[in-house]
């Protein structure tokens, strides 16, 4: 095939060590794999921007799609191997740039990085080969800093974190792999402050750091290629620098220092935990107190290369509020009016889908042998047989994580509510149903393969939560390693999702953070109960109120929040507040089962409503995605124009309008399948 020499040009400014690169749909552009992308070369400065170019041979007459990103190219791990690529920012327009070269030589001036067809759409990258360390200081359980000296008893403290790499002897290497390839990645540090009112992200700190406040979450994010080779130094200062200041000190108000070697975290073998570090005085180097440092380690998803072909992490197409089937056809165990189909089974999910549910919501966690299973509770009841008893049936509560997938399929298991049932034997017989789609504990892979792709999945990732009183969900104070747990679930979804619409959600803020950092395709919503009279308050400060949940979602750059209906009915302004911040908002809770409440919530402007027994309110019908697909076909095929099937107008009221604050790509939305 005749080649065409295409010169791609883009303008933009970079940080030291960064380059622009191009990635696209053909071999020459890496087949959407950023590791095989082509780096652009700096040509000359033009005003406030710099011109970057790359000359690439493409097949003449063949259409090619592509995107630009900025990041770092690092030396290969092995001789002759591919470069390690770190993506900092990339273009995520729903429709990528495209070209069909028809001449032997052509120059493509793509203007400013991130702007395509007049619309700027950029998103942050994900972890490709680097590790992210998060260190947090907060008052969720107790004040993070405790100093024993009397003169500091009433002091408030400021903290500054300094990041240093441990010294290593390095050979001088004057032979560069290329002008765009770095020998090593520079460690990065970002400081974040999250509260009800706002969030702040900074790459620099005041000389005396930031103040610790009871209502504020302070977080330090470090990206590094050497997670076990860092020295992290916390310096503590008095909040009120007008008192206890020793004249002539280099750092007025300096109280003491705590040091953490990242190897301590690495050697613990844990993805999350709490470390207590001694605080040493500024002069005598005696221990004067301690600091509690909450940490998580986020590792890249192993054995899976994320594609740049498309991303929905921050994309939401404006529609009327979507109906989402709670646990499929509804709660069948603990609510006032139980669903007629057992919850979280394929039959239940299929029932909701057949009644027009746009999405079905269900819960996923792992069996003992690391198989992702669909089940709501962290524990279940195992049937025990007693000897020499008139009633041989006894129920024993056991964590789901203690049973293998085969055991979950073969053993006679009951929901924990069976413990409260007077006739336990009868409750067991009622649950017995050998039709496979009615069986509890289907695997996530089985569910992905069984339901039609036009049904969206809202996958809630289960994790243990601690209540403010110290009690843990399911009385489980320990659980799986968070990285291993998520890697298995995410790979199962990414490898089996096809073209299905998927939205993740979780009550655990760290799960939301990790899902965002480990993959670039699917969005996640932060589940929050806010202020509730129904449920006990959670320990995590980020879960306490709906406003701080919004601030967290903004800080993590996730799609939005899934708020408790009880809190939204009490504070309707939260809905528009979330939208003004560019967030999508779903709602959940028993109050959503009331049709009058659903009417109010739709008027408020929520994007999705999760509720039980959709079959009670909607007849068997196609969902909105199927109707939209039919509308597209009608436009493309004239013979379908007179079809009497439901149309989009059946779902869209006259008052419907586009929400300008939600990330929406206006270019060719309807031509992208399953957007």
Swiss-Prot record:
UniProt-annotated binding residues for substrate: 70, 88-89
Matches recorded under CDD domains: CBM20_Prei4, GDPD_GDE5
Keywords: Cytoplasm, Hydrolase, Phosphoprotein
Any one Gene Ontology molecular-function term assigned to this protein's record: glycerophosphodiester phosphodiesterase activity
Pfam family, one: GDPD
A GO term from the CC aspect: cytosol
List of residues that carry Phosphoserine: 178, 427
Main location per the UniProt record: cytoplasm
GP-PDE domain residues: 321-621
Record-linked SUPFAM superfamilies: PLC-like phosphodiesterases, Starch-binding domain-like
Top-level taxon of the source organism: Eukaryota
Domain CBM20: 1-115
Assigned protein family: Belongs to the glycerophosphoryl diester phosphodiesterase family.
Role noted for this protein: May be involved in the negative regulation of skeletal muscle differentiation, independently of its glycerophosphocholine phosphodiesterase activity.
Protein name: Glycerophosphocholine phosphodiesterase GPCPD1
């Amino acid at each position: 095939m005749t080649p065409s020499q295409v010169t791609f040009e883009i303008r933009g400014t970079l940080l030291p060590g960064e380059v622009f690169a191009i990635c696209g749909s053909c071999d020459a552009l890496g087949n959407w794999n950023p590791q095989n992308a082509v780096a652009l070369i700096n040509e000359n400065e033009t005003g406030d921007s710099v011109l970057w170019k790359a000359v690439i041979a493409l097949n003449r007459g063949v259409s090619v799609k592509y995107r630009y990103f900025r990041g770092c190219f690092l030396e290969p791990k092995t001789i002759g191997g591919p470069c390690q690529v770190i993506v900092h920012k990339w273009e995520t327009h729903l429709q990528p740039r495209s070209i069909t070269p028809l001449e032997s030589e052509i120059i493509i001036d793509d203007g400013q990085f991130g702007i395509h067809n007049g619309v700027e759409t950029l998103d942050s990258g994900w972890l490709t080969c680097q590790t992210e360390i998060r260190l947090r200081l907060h008052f969720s359980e107790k004040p993070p800093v405790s100093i024993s000296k009397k003169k500091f008893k009433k002091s408030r403290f400021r903290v500054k974190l300094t990041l240093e790499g441990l010294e290593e002897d390095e050979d001088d290497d004057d032979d560069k792999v290329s002008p765009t390839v770095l020998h090593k990645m520079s460690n990065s540090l970002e400081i974040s402050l999250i509260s009800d009112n706002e969030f702040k992200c900074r790459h620099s700190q005041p000389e005396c750091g930031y103040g610790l406040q009871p209502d504020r979450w302070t977080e330090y994010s470090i990206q590094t290629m050497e997670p076990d080779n860092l020295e992290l130094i916390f310096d503590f200062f008095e909040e009120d620098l007008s008192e206890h200041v020793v004249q002539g000190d280099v750092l007025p108000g300096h109280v003491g220092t705590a040091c953490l070697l990242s190897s301590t975290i690495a050697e613990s073998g844990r993805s999350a935990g709490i470390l207590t570090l001694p605080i040493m005085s500024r002069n005598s180097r005696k221990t004067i107190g301690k600091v509690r440092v909450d940490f998580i380690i986020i590792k890249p998803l192993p054995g899976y290369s994320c594609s740049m072909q498309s991303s929905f992490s921050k994309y939401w197409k404006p529609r009327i509020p979507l109906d989402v089937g709670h646990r499929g056809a509804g709660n069948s165990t603990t609510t006032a009016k139980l669903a007629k189909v057992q919850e979280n089974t394929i039959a239940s999910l299929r029932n909701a889908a057949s009644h027009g549910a746009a999405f079905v919501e269900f819960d996923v966690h792992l069996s003992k042998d690391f198989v992702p299973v669909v089940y709501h509770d962290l524990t279940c009841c195992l049937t025990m047989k007693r000897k020499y008893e008139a009633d041989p049936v006894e129920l024993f509560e056991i964590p789901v994580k203690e049973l293998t997938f085969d055991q979950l399929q073969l053993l006679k298991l009951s929901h924990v509510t069976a413990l409260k049932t007077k006739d336990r034997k009868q409750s067991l017989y009622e649950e017995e149903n050998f039709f496979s789609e009615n069986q509890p504990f289907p695997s996530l892979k089985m569910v992905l393969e069984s339901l039609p792709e036009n049904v969206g999945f809202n996958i809630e990732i289960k994790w243990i939560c601690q209540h403010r009183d110290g009690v843990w969900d399911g009385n489980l104070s320990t659980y799986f390693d968070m990285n291993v747990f998520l890697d298995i679930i995410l790979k199962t979804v990414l490898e089996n999702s096809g073209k299905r619409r998927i939205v993740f959600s979780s009550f655990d803020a760290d799960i939301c953070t990790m899902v965002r950092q480990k993959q670039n395709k699917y969005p996640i919503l932060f589940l929050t109960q806010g202020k509730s009279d129904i449920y006990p308050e959670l320990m995590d400060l980020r879960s306490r109120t709906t406003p701080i949940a919004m601030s967290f979602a903004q800080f993590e750059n996730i799609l939005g929040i899934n708020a408790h209906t009880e809190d939204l009915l009490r504070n309707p302004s939260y809905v528009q507040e979330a939208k003004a911040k560019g967030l999508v908002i779903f709602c959940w809770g028993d109050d959503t089962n009331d049709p009058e409440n659903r009417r109010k919530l739709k008027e408020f402007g929520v994007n999705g409503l999760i509720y039980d027994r959709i079959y009670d309110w909607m007849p068997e019908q196609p969902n909105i995605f199927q109707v939209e697909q039919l509308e597209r076909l009608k436009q493309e095929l004239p013979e379908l124009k007179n079809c009497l099937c439901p149309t989009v107008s059946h779902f869209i009221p006259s008052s419907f309008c586009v929400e300008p604050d939600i990330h929406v790509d206006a270019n060719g939305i309807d031509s992208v399948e399953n957007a």
